[in-house]
Design a protein with these regions (language model features):
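Primarily the internal scaffold of c-type cytochrome electron-transfer domains
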Residues: 6-158, 162-182
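An acidic-aromatic substrate-binding cleft motif
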Residues: 1-3
Length: 182
């Protein structure tokens, strides 16, 4: 369900077969932002009521970085978020695929909290190399949830461009946004 948008397995117990369907092959807008019909309507008919919609018709706007800045704290050499993080929508959107998890319900409901629809795995022995790098695929949300960075309000999109998956800055520059060089 992470390599296709709106994947439905549709197991048929009578025939012991799956009738799998999907909306789009690969990750598309709706995988993270939810159903797009309201967004399409917003774009087609920009009436005064819809033009003012700050979320542009998206179910999940994922705009937690908007208006946020990382302010250096001289005493620690690190930075703190200002204003503090108001929610975890971005993390939940990323965790749909970037977490070891087991679904508790069928399908993805963008209106519900991911932690109510999935059981997330946390740190387990053998999953990481001694230097902290992952041994397997990019299932890193469980460890991120237990990190100091998460506790400080860092989100996935502070470091990663959500549309490309690449780091926002090259090399150590991404870390230097918040951490002063030693």
């Amino acid at each position: 369900d992470c390599h296709s948008t709106d994947l439905q397995r549709n197991y048929d117990a009578a025939t012991d077969r799956y009738k799998t369907t999907f909306a789009e092959m690969n990750v598309a807008c709706e995988a993270c932002h939810g159903p797009g019909s309201n967004h399409v309507e917003w774009a087609r008919n920009p009436t005064p009521g819809t033009a003012a919609d700050p979320h542009h018709g998206l179910v999940m706007a994922l705009d937690e970085r908007k208006g946020a800045a990382w302010i250096p704290v001289p005493e620690t050499g690190n930075a703190r978020r200002s204003p503090s993080l108001a929610g975890h929508r971005t993390l939940a959107a990323c965790a749909q695929c970037h977490a070891r998890r087991a679904p508790l319900v069928a399908g993805m409901d963008h209106q519900r909290d991911l932690f109510d629809t999935h059981e997330l795995s946390l740190l387990e022995a053998g999953r990481y190399f001694d230097d902290g790098q992952q041994r397997e695929e990019v299932y890193n949300v469980g460890s991120f949830l237990q990190s100091r960075m998460h506790a400080a309000g860092v989100t996935c999109t502070d470091c990663h461009d959500p549309h490309s998956g690449k780091l926002r800055l090259a090399g150590n520059q991404v870390c230097s946004q918040c951490h002063a060089p030693a």
